[in-house]
A protein has these predicted regions:
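P-loop (Walker A) phosphate-binding loop of NTP-binding proteins
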Residues: 12
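ATP-binding Walker
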Residues: 15
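Hydrophobic anchor at the beta1->P-loop junction of P-loop NTPases
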Residues: 9
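Phosphate-binding P-loop
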Residues: 1-4
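Conserved substrate/cofactor phosphate-moiety recognition/catalytic segment
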Residues: 25-90, 96
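ATP-dependent NMP and nucleoside kinases share a basic, alpha-helical "lid"
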Residues: 99-104, 110-131
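Walker A/P-loop
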Residues: 18
Length: 131
């Protein structure tokens, strides 16, 4: 059995990625596993999912939602600490391993930085990926 196909959905929060993934699962003849960043975020211990956590706190080491000002507007920014970055790297490689075992995958992610796309390219380099 060969590697599975990978469909990559990238977009901002609430852009409809999960809805599109669900529709694709219904329409495609083969089974596609929907794997989302949210699943890995939710799998982190609660103390590593911060809300404006200070430097050095567990929430700042994982995924930290930080309020900030941009052009006079209050917005939120997602900051990943060392544990959060480790989880993201592991997630990308887990997705690649899943596909290499012959499973078709729909990735539902948000590429916060260009380095994340580069890391996906390394992890998925030998697989067929549709963006």
């Amino acid at each position: 059995m060969g590697a599975g196909n990978v469909i990559f959905l990238n977009g901002s929060s609430s852009a409809g990625k999960t809805t599109i993934a669900t529709m694709l699962q219904q329409l495609l003849p083969d089974p596609y596993q929907h794997i989302a960043l949210d699943q890995f975020r939710d799998g982190m211990p609660g103390r590593f999912r911060g809300l404006n956590s200070p430097e050095g706190a567990p929430g700042a080491r994982g995924l930290n939602v930080v309020p900030t000002q941009r052009e006079g507007q209050l917005v939120t920014r997602i900051a990943f600490g060392d544990h959060g970055e480790q989880v993201l790297r592991g997630m990308r490689r887990a997705i690649a391993a899943f596909a290499r075992e012959g499973n078709h995958v729909i990735i539902d992610d948000l590429l916060f930085r260009p380095e994340y796309l580069h890391d996906y390219a390394l992890a998925l380099e030998d697989l067929d990926v549709w963006l």
